[in-house]
């Protein structure tokens, strides 16, 4: 399938605090942004525009968060944006020098089944400490493109958005759907909940049922309320 230029791609930047996400946003958008928020919350997001290869990228820099649970205003804001706005592509900005902590959020994004490209940011810090990371192998393993970037200098940003285009056009060779296996005990618990959600057509048609099942098993109060509302309309 040939790429169709002249399209607008809605992109959300998601990552931990201090991962260089906002620096990436500022470099891409030229820091020409406006601030948006949801009523009733104290956190906000910056929105800007970026052009490359005939595409227009509408970028939202969401607040830094360590997870997509329902405990902090930042977590709720990011999750609300992903669920309600449903961006075309999520750029998950990851601190290359602190992978274990950062990839927890990545796993939750995979659970949500969002279309995603990972910016392996602060790549110079990884190299400065003499470390190496086979990001291509991880990319193939999780079915998600990974691009090394240094947001403060702009290194890798052009390639990052080229991969965003490929994922948007469903032309990236790495892209595939996976789910993270949480072991026999949890998987046996997830399956019947997911199946019940699938049978209820009025419950969140646009949201991935496996993700909802996991959140229900976690006792997530917001998802529990959401599912109850859906049942009330059956």
Where are the language model's segments positioned?
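Conserved G1/Walker A P-loop phosphate-binding module
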Residues: 1-68, 85
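Residue-level signature of catalytic and energy-coupling elements of molecular machines
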Residues: 12, 24-25, 43, 61, ...
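Conserved nucleotide-binding/hydrolysis micro-motifs of P-loop NTPases
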Residues: 31, 40, 64-65, 96-100, ...
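Helical mechanochemical/support elements of P-loop NTPase systems and associated helical scaffolds
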Residues: 39-43, 55-58, 70, 74-77, ...
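Conserved C-terminal guanine-recognition region of P-loop GTPase G domains, centered on the G4
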Residues: 50-54, 77-146
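Canonical P-loop GTPase G-domain recognition
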Residues: 126-180
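Charged, amphipathic alpha-helical segments characteristic of ABC-type P-loop ATPases involved
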Residues: 178-216, 220-226
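Residue-level detector of conserved catalytic or cofactor/ligand-binding positions
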Residues: 228-234
């Amino acid at each position: 399938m040939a790429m169709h230029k002249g399209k607008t791609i809605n992109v959300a930047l998601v990552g931990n605090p201090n991962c260089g996400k906002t620096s990436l946003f500022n470099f891409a958008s030229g820091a020409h942004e406006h601030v948006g928020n949801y009523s009733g919350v104290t956190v906000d997001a910056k929105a800007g525009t970026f052009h490359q290869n005939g595409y227009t990228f509408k970028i939202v820099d969401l607040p830094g968060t360590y997870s997509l649970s329902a405990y902090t205003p930042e977590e709720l804001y990011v999750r609300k944006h992903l669920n309600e706005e449903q961006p075309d592509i999520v750029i998950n900005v990851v601190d290359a020098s602190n992978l274990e902590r950062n990839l927890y959020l990545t796993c939750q994004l995979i659970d949500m089944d969002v279309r995603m490209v990972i910016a392996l940011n602060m790549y110079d810090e990884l190299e400065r400490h003499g470390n190496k990371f086979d990001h291509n192998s991880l990319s193939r393993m999780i079915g998600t493109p990974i691009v090394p970037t240094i947001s403060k200098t702009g290194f890798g940003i052009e390639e990052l958005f080229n991969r965003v285009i490929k994922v948007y056009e469903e032309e990236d060779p790495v892209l595939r759907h996976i789910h993270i296996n949480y072991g026999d005990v949890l998987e046996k618990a997830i399956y019947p909940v997911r199946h019940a959600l699938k049978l209820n057509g009025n419950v969140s048609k646009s949201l991935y049922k496996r993700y909802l099942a996991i959140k229900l098993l976690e006792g997530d109060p917001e998802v529990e309320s959401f599912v109850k509302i859906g049942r009330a309309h059956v």
